């Protein structure tokens, strides 16, 4: 059974809070949960790139995102999914990455439709199709309010 639940949404949309609340409830039901923050969090490559987010051109950005995501999937997500009674709660996966990049392409009037890339990676067992994707979409005013209160970070600053 694929116990892989992904939470997608922009910064400050409530993904982490929702994931933590769900994790508590799942543990009450007798299952183990693993919270995984995803791209640009755990690998040296991802941490290095996170510091330079917004300073690289889009093809390089896409390459870094997917390389880091592939490493994260192989080294963190897949091993946990082999454990019995374990549910991986993923804070962003490939939907957020492809959507951000597509939206940026639309903004600069360039075709950055890369949705076929994660699809090919899933079909070739490089990335994993989530058993459930949860899209956190609060009203825009709430996002703005939360973003104003959020700490400075290359990721948040990129989307401000």
Which residues does each predicted region cover?
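Phosphate-binding P-loop
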Residues: 1-2
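Hydrophobic anchor at the beta1->P-loop junction of P-loop NTPases
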Residues: 5-7
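ATP-binding Walker
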Residues: 12-13
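Walker A/P-loop
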Residues: 16
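Post-Walker A helix-loop "phosphate-sensing" segment adjacent to the P-loop in P-loop NTPases
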Residues: 24-34
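ATP-dependent small-molecule kinase phosphotransfer cores
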Residues: 36-116
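A glycine- and Lys/Arg-enriched "phosphate-lid" helix/loop adjacent to the NTP-binding pocket
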Residues: 97-160
């Amino acid at each position: 059974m694929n116990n892989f639940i992904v939470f997608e949404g922009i910064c400050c949309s409530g993904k982490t809070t929702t994931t933590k609340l769900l994790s508590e409830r799942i543990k009450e039901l007798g299952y183990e949960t693993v919270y995984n923050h995803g791209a640009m969090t755990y690998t040296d490559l991802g941490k290095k790139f996170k510091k330079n987010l917004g300073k690289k051109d889009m093809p390089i950005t896409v390459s870094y995102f997917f390389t880091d995501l592939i490493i994260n999937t192989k080294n963190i997500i897949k091993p946990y999914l082999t454990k019995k009674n374990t549910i991986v709660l993923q804070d962003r996966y490939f939907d957020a990455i492809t959507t951000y990049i597509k939206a940026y392409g639309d903004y600069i009037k360039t075709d950055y439709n890369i949705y076929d890339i994660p699809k090919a990676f899933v079909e070739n067992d490089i990335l994993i199709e989530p058993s459930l994707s949860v899209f956190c979409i609060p009203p825009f005013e709430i996002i703005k309010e939360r973003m104003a209160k959020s700490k400075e970070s290359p990721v948040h600053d990129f989307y401000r």
